[in-house]
Amino acid sequence: MQSTIKPVEYDRPVAAGTVCGVGQAWAKVPDAPSAEERAALKARIKALLAREKAVLVAHYYVDAELQELADETGGCVADSLEMARFGRDHDAQTLVVAGVRFMGETAKILSPGKRVLMPDLDATCSLDLGCPADEFSAFCDAHPDRTVVVYANTSAAVKARADWMVTSSIGLEIVADLHARGEKIIWAPDRHLGSYIQKKTGADMLLWQGSCLVHDEFKGIELDLLRAEYPDAKVLVHPESPENVVAQADVVGSTTQLIDAAVKLDATHFIVATDLGILHKMQLAAPGKTFIAAPTAGNSATCKSCAHCPWMAMNGLANLADVLERGHNEIFVDPAIGVRARLPIDRMLDFAAAHKKRVQASGDLQRDQQLFANVGAA
């Protein structure tokens, strides 16, 4: 049984300088600065981070120069699980989150006493938009016997309705544990990730029908053709991708797991099915290896892979400097919602820490890594 919701409609901004992402999603993207402007902005941002005693937390999908700034200033470039941990544990009282809104909300939930800023508060997520809190709450009310598990890519209000929050790096293990205890599950919002976990674990899951507009655009037929061009390439796939893409993967995993695979696998070429922003970190982690973007369009298209989130692209040097200078674009979460939303997040973090210790104690790294190895790998 699966839920159904109306497709998300995205409004095109009327201002100039916008960009079309994929799936007809539009976002106001900062103009690219010149080389001189870029150098000046970076210097200004570094000075402002020091002045404000702030730390920059960036996701793998934001532009390379923001990732570089985070690394150079003692911040963090990571997936959403590590971003959550880092922001919670860092001494800085001001967190600047370069990513999309749910990441800023999660940082605020875990650090309610800290100031959380974002370059652009309109940077959202199709998974978040596709799972309105009121509709999801009604769906949960209709199935009161089920444990509610939600993906990190959701609003604070949706997290507050959940029993567990998960990220792609730990979701499979958590669902497997719940299934072993005989629990039936409501999963939201990504249908592809939910279906993948359902097949790997055999869990009884009702799937909310959301999707990531970037990963949903990857094409199985075109990927098969690209693999024929690069027969020795390993295929790295994020599990938010459609089933016919996941089925061709050598490795299925979170952003961090895909980067690790690029480093550890004995291959020189990799086809990567996730947001193009990750290629910066892959190239740094595995110099000398070649990374090829998986196709999101057919042979007749002028752009074979447009796999970059338009909302991630809203994070730029200029608006990052501006938010540090002015102290605006602060994230606020209703305290009552924040308290409830923290419970499923803390459950995930505690589970992840305990799971890591179990794996390290057993020394069975191969078993752990194979949790995200695709059973139908080519």
UniProtKB/Swiss-Prot annotation:
[4Fe-4S] cluster binds at C125, C212, C309. Iminosuccinate binds at H59, S80, Y151, A152, N153, S168, H238, P239, E240, T255. It comes from the Bacteria. Pathway: Cofactor biosynthesis; NAD(+) biosynthesis; quinolinate from iminoaspartate: step 1/1. One of its GO terms (biological process) is 'de novo' NAD biosynthetic process from L-aspartate. It catalyses: iminosuccinate + dihydroxyacetone phosphate = quinolinate + phosphate + 2 H2O + H(+). Gene3D superfamilies: NadA-like. Keywords: 4Fe-4S, Cytoplasm, Iron, Iron-sulfur, Metal-binding, Pyridine nucleotide biosynthesis, Transferase. One of its GO terms (molecular function) is 4 iron, 4 sulfur cluster binding. Binds 1 [4Fe-4S] cluster per subunit. Its cofactor is [4Fe-4S] cluster. InterPro entries: NadA, NadA_sf, Quinolinate_synth_A_type1. It is found in: Cytoplasm. GO terms for cellular component: cytosol. Its EC number is 2.5.1.72. Belongs to the quinolinate synthase family. Type 1 subfamily. Catalyzes the condensation of iminoaspartate with dihydroxyacetone phosphate to form quinolinate. This is Quinolinate synthase. It comes from Burkholderia ambifaria (strain ATCC BAA-244 / DSM 16087 / CCUG 44356 / LMG 19182 / AMMD). The lineage of its organism: Bacteria, Pseudomonadati, Pseudomonadota, Betaproteobacteria, Burkholderiales.
